[in-house]
Amino acid sequence: MSAFNTTLPSLDYDDDTLREHLQGADIPTLLLTVAHLTGDLQILKPNWKPSIAMGVARSGMDLETEAQVREFCLQRLIDFRDSGQPAPGRPTSDQLHILGTWLMGPVIEPYLPLIAEEAVTAEEDLRAPRWHKDHVASGRDFKVVIIGAGESGMIAALRFKQAGVPFVIYEKGNDVGGTWRENTYPGCRVDINSFWYSFSFARGIWDDCFAPAPQVFAYMQAVAREHGLYEHIRFNTEVSDAHWDESTQRWQLLYRDSEGQTQVDSNVVVFAVGQLNRPMIPAIPGIETFKGPMFHSAQWDHDVDWSGKRVGVIGTGASATQFIPQLAQTAAELKVFARTTNWLLPTPDLHEKISDSCKWLLAHVPHYSLWYRVAMAMPQSVGFLEDVMVDVGYPPTELAVSARNDRLRQDISAWMEPQFADRPDLREVLIPDSPVGGKRIVRDNGTWISTLKRDNVSMIRQPIEVITPKGICCVDGTEHEFDLIVYGTGFHASKFLMPINVTGRDGVALHDVWKGDDARAYLGMTVPQFPNMFCMYGPNTGLVVYSTVIQFSEMTASYIVDAVRLLLEGGHQSMEVKTPVFESYNQRVDEGNALRAWGFSKVNSWYKNSKGRVTQNFPFTAVEFWQRTHSVEPTDYQLG
């Protein structure tokens, strides 16, 4: 990522240049762009309608028809250029309806108000607060503390800055970026297309379809610089305690930095500490006896050279499927220990670069970047939630939870099966015995299975009994000797806000309320007995089959900033979610999760806590979360 698209370009290029670069255009994006620029929505012919498969819009045309469409669009762009017309603004609601239903059909209609916030020009930010502290409570002393400067902390900070609310961020690391600063393992990259895994107000120019971690980290740094966030951040500062002081109606926070411990107070505290940042290393007997290097993928030791070494990897989650192919290229021997396996989501462009022509179109054709993002946002916002819904009359099993789920299973299996043609033994190992969506689906372009087919790679499904000084011993008595062991075993995802000690009214400890790993919150944000406390990316806000964490973070930040508006505008000191509201919401979430593949299946996954309750996932649609978080309902809260 080298810059931002921040201005609307002019189409000041000759015919040959346009023709050359249109050869690299995405057909659905090109048609949407030309229809918007010219105002002629009739060009969106039914026979040019794209196909939607697994959350992606593709042209679905043969090469001859694609060539005809490119030539047609070229002539329309030439006419637009020669007419001297200025580019229109963002699409109207009527235009968005026509363009959206052409792309997606009627399924998109409920989502259009949400999509409208994504369908903006590069200069616009429709989610910015429409109020300012100077206008609602100019003389009031008021401060917000945000804990964490990852993507969610950054968007919360920007919204408070836009609203004129004083704030400070305490970040335990030495820079912004959160997980993208911390995770440096080989092969680390996003599993959402780069243009969709980005803020709605900061349209980046990316080098890869699915950006490697260094690009995402650079993007986060660029956003922080562009919006003046660095000056509000205290780095290398770790908050250890947060206590609600009833007498002052403020939070008392204790943090440690290079100068020791300091106590500060704030009216509101926002926890933006993430979920996937505390590595989980299983308690395997003998773990301390291994004589070689041993580390978790999130704490990669770059001083260790695995070339020519015998390497053992425990776990096959999303991170492991990224770093294992890197290790396999030069390791002498690589053995992968896996309890369960993942369904793979076919993603041909997973490791592809953005073409020069695509970059040119994004930079030089008005609104092409808008529609390039929206053509992803529409199918991704809908996702395939319906494909993982349990149909109790089907009936659901560990193979499939509905007819739609079974079709998805068959589609993915049809993509995987040919890769096993020369290794039928791997089929028995790699085809999951759980429904699609039962655990996290992993993107792949064929690399994963081809890696496991290498002569120097093998997968071990025998349970591990003990780690020895020489390696790993399984329950069948086989000892596998290694020079290096890497854990790809995920994180303590269910232990929200750990290890920070948080106490609310009457000294109630939050982690006691949550019983360690059974976190619950209203809208994933707020909890009774903990006034003026909000979480970003909190309990049951995880997304696994649609949308992105960044889109949900933007929604969450909008809600939290609106809550602060309510406090300031009404002259209130505190707001605390009512217990019946909290309980009703969480009951519905639990019931919803029970009727999703991840709640029905018995397969082990990080979506669930130690008791089997789903603490991670939001089981409903993206548009429902948007509707619930668009503004605060005052009657949900006890205001004091």
Swiss-Prot record:
Catalytic activity, reaction form: 4'-hydroxyacetophenone + NADPH + O2 + H(+) = 4-acetoxyphenol + NADP(+) + H2O
Site, as annotated: Transition state stabilizer: 440
Thermoactivity: Optimum temperature is 30 degrees Celsius.
UniProt effect for mutating residue 439 to N: 20-fold decrease in catalytic efficiency with NADPH. 6-fold higher efficiency with NADH
EC class of the enzyme, as a word: oxidoreductase
Highest taxon in the source lineage: Bacteria
Cofactor remark: Binds 1 FAD per subunit.
Binding locations of FAD: 152, 171, 180, 191-192, 197, 239, 275
pH profile of the protein: Optimum pH is 7.5.
Record GO terms (molecular function): 4-hydroxyacetophenone monooxygenase activity; flavin adenine dinucleotide binding; N,N-dimethylaniline monooxygenase activity; NADP binding
EC identifiers of the protein: 1.14.13.84
Record keyword Flavoprotein present: yes
Cofactor(s) needed by this chain: FAD
Activity regulation annotation text: Inhibited by amino-NADP(+).
Gene3D superfamilies recorded: FAD/NAD(P)-binding domain (3.50.50.60)
Record's keyword terms, sorted: FAD, Flavoprotein, Monooxygenase, NADP, Oxidoreductase
Protein family (similarity comment): Belongs to the FAD-binding monooxygenase family.
Main function: Catalyzes a Baeyer-Villiger oxidation reaction, i.e. the insertion of an oxygen atom into a carbon-carbon bond adjacent to a carbonyl, which converts ketones to esters. Can oxidize a wide range of acetophenone derivatives. Highest activity occurs with compounds bearing an electron-donating substituent at the para position of the aromatic ring, e.g. 4-hydroxyacetophenone and 4-aminoacetophenone, leading to the formation of 4-hydroxyphenyl acetate and 4-aminophenyl acetate, respectively. Is also able to oxidize sulfides.
Assembly description: Homodimer.
Name of the molecule in the record: 4-hydroxyacetophenone monooxygenase
